Amino acid sequence: MYPRQKRIVDLVLATTVLVLLSPLLLLIVTAFGLDTLVVRRDRGPLLYAERRISRGREFSLLKFRTLREDVLMRAAGHARPYERDVANLTVAGRLLKRWYLDELPQLFNIVRGDMSFVGPRPWPPGLVEQQMRDGVDYRNHVVAGLTGAAQVTKGVPEARYAASDLDYVRELNTRRGWSVVAYDLRLMVRTLGVLARGQGLAD
């Protein structure tokens, strides 16, 4: 479930944003380098990848590393629960998480076609399998997104994420072509509002 028009907009927009944000990306790399130079426990790779599912296929989700490397090793491929504790974050990682900047490398995932700008957030294989055992399998049919309906509604409990995602899937089923793009753009504008308030987005 990935309309051609949606893919075209994703590719053009992701490429454009990468070019426009190249100074910011350079600044992040510089800040990360200074952090690892000054704070010994923050040392480690700039990027890390997690196994996630999009349209039933496994791919490597890219992120700027925000966790200390020793914590990341304990995370075993699912860092989100550890990111809630500020003590686990690097100095640079605290700023990246607040403004959602750790997700910027996923623009490359969008260019590659692993993800879209809008869709259910990609989950690790284990969580997708658990969701399928509960009788919910929409993640095997819909392309994952950088943001989605659940992420732009702050305060929604995690138990409601699936319901919000299913609302989005229903919209995809009832819309065609550019109508899907228009709906995505509305969610993207709402995402910018959340980011402007520095609230971060749920995974």
Where do the model's predicted regions map?
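Short, well-ordered beta-strand elements within core beta-sheets of diverse protein domains
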Residues: A92-W99, N173-R176
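Residue-level signal for cytosolic alpha-helical hairpin/rod architecture
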Residues: V12, L89-A92
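A hydrophobic, helix-centered structural microdomain
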Residues: M1-E69, V181-D203
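Soluble non-cytosolic domains of exported or imported proteins
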Residues: V86, R98-D102
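Short helix-coil transition/hinge motifs at the ends and kinks of transmembrane helices
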Residues: L37-D42, A76-H78, T174-R176
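Short, glycine-rich, amphipathic interfacial segments at transmembrane boundaries or analogous
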Residues: G44-A87, T147-V169
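Hydrophobic structural segments characteristic of membrane proteins
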Residues: R52, P105-D203
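Juxtamembrane loop-helix boundary motifs flanking transmembrane segments in multi-pass membrane proteins
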Residues: M1-R4, R84-N88
